[in-house]
Amino acid sequence: MELKKSPDGGWGWVIVFVSFLTQFLCYGSPLAVGVLYIEWLDAFGEGKGKTAWVGSLASGVGLLASPVCSLCVSSFGARPVTIFSGFMVAGGLMLSSFAPNIYFLFFSYGIVVGLGCGLLYTATVTITCQYFDDRRGLALGLISTGSSVGLFIYAALQRMLVEFYGLDGCLLIVGALALNILACGSLMRPLQSSDCPLPKKIAPEDLPDKYSIYNEKGKNLEENINILDKSYSSEEKCRITLANGDWKQDSLLHKNPTVTHTKEPETYKKKVAEQTYFCKQLAKRKWQLYKNYCGETVALFKNKVFSALFIAILLFDIGGFPPSLLMEDVARSSNVKEEEFIMPLISIIGIMTAVGKLLLGILADFKWINTLYLYVATLIIMGLALCAIPFAKSYVTLALLSGILGFLTGNWSIFPYVTTKTVGIEKLAHAYGILMFFAGLGNSLGPPIVGWFYDWTQTYDIAFYFSGFCVLLGGFILLLAALPSWDTCNKQLPKPAPTTFLYKVASNV
């Protein structure tokens, strides 16, 4: 069924509002997991590397499972998937309050909540794109701020709930808040259901010939059967012995329900051959699609700038994601007193990320700015800021660095521009899917690696030197790959809107 023309308004603004709320409710706790990370360290007494897996899984699983999430939305629709994801997120959070050990949290918080976030993000983006065309960039920009606002508010909210109700009470209350996703999801009316009449019921015997199992275009059924019989003339392939009484056939194919002859009916023989041929052609078609996909993937990696971009995004997520998870513990390790905290460091990261998305997206719209080099600049500056964290020993310096890192993390808003410049608009979806998979891998690996460095050295200094080195290395690799290709990268290929749905992924602010 074809969708109606996007209304660019009307009920679409309701979709934008509830999508904003769902992302706020869904991503608030996983993105502000750094507050819970400290409590889990005290509650379970595990190492920082092992404990960091909880937050990293919640962030990375949604990206790693993005193909499955897209398939679910395509198969069942945005509204059912949103409601189901609400159950997953709320259930995972509430289940985490009963966790007896850290391994249970890997499943309840890391996998269940993370997968729920991935499903919800895909659903909200899909239905928003259906309702908006001319104003799609604005609509997607509005819903994407839900996660950043959620990070800003939930960082302080979870800290307060832990003080008043303890860790378990905090998770129960946050999980109860997430149940509001179900109410929001119920308002996500599919676009085609607005005024499309329900299909009429048709009796099986009234079905036209076009609903037969297979009918080659331009030929009648008898000609098709002759072609099939030539391919499958062997008696061993086509003969089916009917014995021991009646055999009941599918009422959609034959009106006579039973056959009592011991000799094989000619019509059934033809139908078997027809179905066999159809299945064979379907298998060949699937194999051809798989070969085409692999061929296109190989062709993408022959582009040296794309290969460098793949390395850069992996290294960026390994090194750039840990601060949002570990910054609160960094402050505690630096003996910063809680009385000095004007605002949680994670809240600063969250609000500055929203500002960075907006300003970097505006900069990318200027024709005289090459977005590839703008993205490289954000990587290099972020790498230097990460290397400066070991020298920050006060709340003011940590807050300043948190703001810088948060602003630069907003480079997700220009990442689709970079991908478009590298591979072209026609290959954007394929290339972006590959890049996001490895971004999820980096998100999952980064915090545990930094935590392991702390367990090994009992200080975050080497850990953040390593993080900064990773991001710097990715930036310089991308810069070196792009410099000789300035002419090809500087061509003004068609650009998506600066806030298009591709820039934000299931686990990033």
Swiss-Prot record:
PANTHER family named in the record: MONOCARBOXYLATE TRANSPORTER, MONOCARBOXYLATE TRANSPORTER 9
Name of the protein in question: Monocarboxylate transporter 9
Described purpose of this protein according to its UniProt entry: Extracellular pH-and Na(+)-sensitive low-affinity creatine transporter. Also functions as a pH-independent carnitine efflux transporter.
PROSITE patterns: MFS
GO MF annotation list: carnitine transmembrane transporter activity; creatine transmembrane transporter activity; monocarboxylic acid transmembrane transporter activity; symporter activity
Residues spanning the membrane: 13-33, 53-73, 80-100, 102-122, 137-157, 164-184, 305-325, 342-362, 372-392, 398-418, 433-453, 462-482
Keywords, in A-Z order: Cell membrane, Membrane, Symport, Transmembrane, Transmembrane helix, Transport
Topological category with respect to the lipid bilayer: Multi-pass membrane protein
Main location: membrane
InterPro entries hit by this protein: MCT9, MFS, MFS_dom, MFS_trans_sf, Proton-linked_MCT
Source organism of the structure: Homo sapiens
Catalyzed chemical reaction(s): creatine(in) = creatine(out); (R)-carnitine(in) = (R)-carnitine(out)
Places the protein is found: Cell membrane
UniProt activity-regulation remark: 4-guanidinobutyrate and guanidinoethyl sulfonate inhibit the transport activity.
Cytoplasmic side: 1-12, 483-509
Family classification: Belongs to the major facilitator superfamily. Monocarboxylate porter (TC 2.A.1.13) family.
Signal sequence extent: none
GO biological process terms held by the UniProt record: carboxylic acid transmembrane transport; carnitine transmembrane transport; creatine transmembrane transport; urate metabolic process
Domain of life the protein comes from: Eukaryota
CDD domains given in the database record: MFS_MCT9
Cellular compartments per GO CC: plasma membrane
